[in-house]
Amino acid sequence: EPGAPDHQYAIIKMKGINVGGSAQTTANLGVTFKPFKGFRIGAEYTLYDRNYAYYSLSGSNLSMGKTMNLLEPWRVPTAGQLDMRASYHFQIGGLNATLSGNINNLLNQYYIEKAWNPSTVSENITEVNADNVYFYFAKGLTYNIRLKINF
């Protein structure tokens, strides 16, 4: 038994369990065009795969003196997002200026960005119940426009 006789302990089996809260695989492909002087337009696609739900261990979900299994966190479905950007450099009254903008999530896709497993430790359960997983969805289409003047 680990520790001193008057200490509580729990053995947690977690060999081979994936890290939660971070995509294990990401890929990004971007392209930029300069069709004429001062103007740029581009897009990039980011793919998120093998992303697992966040989980945590605490005294409230452990059985002291027992061997517990850490369950494989719930796997978030593969997702991706297409973003677009453009900028134009010009002069206003002899001052350098840039007008630029971004469109994030151009295709307005709703996908699970994060997930949370509230209970991932068990003595006898071998799989996470997907009905108990909380989801956080990505924002839909968003955009911003900027005007920068150097003086």
Labelled PLM ranges:
Residues 29-32, 81-85, 90, 98:
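Transmembrane beta-barrel strand/turn architecture of Gram-negative outer membrane proteins
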Residues 26, 85, 142:
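Active-site phosphate/pyrophosphate-handling residues
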Residues 41, 84, 145:
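A broad, low-specificity signal marking well-ordered, structured residues that form hydrophobic/aromatic
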Residues 76-84, 104-105, 109:
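Conserved long hydrophobic alpha-helices within structured protein cores
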